[in-house]
Amino acid sequence: MEKIKILGIAPYQEMEPLMRDIAKSYDNLELYTFTGFYKNAIQFAKAFPDKEFDVIVSRGGTADLVRSLNDTPVVKIKVSTLDLLRVITQALQCSSRAAVVSYSYITDRVEMLAKFLRLDIRTFSFETPEQIEDTVKQCARAGYDLIVGGAATRDYAVAEGAQFLLITSSRESVEASIQQAIEQHHLINDVLDKN
């Protein structure tokens, strides 16, 4: 049986060994991983010709950017509601002036959780990677001393003198994405075989 070649782009260092550990449970999988986000992830993905990998797995804005620049199918690692609840709870235990700075599809869910669970956490949204720095500065100027966000937000938060908590994806979320990548590869091959 031919192995499925997946490129895993981990947005933070701890995800890379998690991806490799999950991949061990699949006999038909050849996983290549590296840690990177946005520009360095795109440079890495572009270094490989299209179709060198069967599927690329990544998260957030990095997955969106890689998808727009590459013909290889991209599966996005999800951030579950439990992942968000975990980091929000931790943030509120550390500071009463905590805020989430992320894409609107994340901050909308945080606002829903905050309203439902009566949590006092503010959100600041951005839509493109180019907006991250200004959004973090806006958050810091508003007096928030702990910023919760993705890997690309970290450096800007630290530069503003804020504490930072990373939104991480659970093992279950990463595992589901790898499984989805395998299923997507099989589906594409089935369609190509019929043509």
What function would you assign to each model-found segment?
Residues 1-195:
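Non-catalytic structural scaffold of enzyme domains
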